[in-house]
Amino acid sequence: RSLVVGKPAAQMLIKKNATVTVCHTMTVDMPSVVKEADIVIVAAGRAGVVDDSYVRPGQIIIDVGINVNEEGKLCGDVDYAKVGPIVDAITPVPGGVGSVTTSVLVGHVVEAAEKASK
């Protein structure tokens, strides 16, 4: 439901005629709901909240989360070690979506600077 990831991602996918289900903290039996999806975009804001009970073979998992774990290392919202062997594809954290986000932000900064200089 967040304005940063949840709503924009849902709107983008709906415009492409995807059937979208949005889960949140009040979703009943979330693991069962998530297992039904072919593509799962995770932006929960909690390290490792999505584990192997949420997934099945054939899924693509896009982990947007950026967290610091107990050891001080960056990690996502998905428990990569448990989920990775089950699903068909998963984005890593670090090195996944964050790299794309940085590139897009740099592009926007350059575009804004060019507009400001005119």
Segments from the language model and where they lie:
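Glycine-rich phosphate/diphosphate-binding loop of Rossmann-like nucleotide-binding domains
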Residues: 1-60, 73-81
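Rossmann-fold NAD(P)-binding glycine/threonine-rich loop
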Residues: 62-117
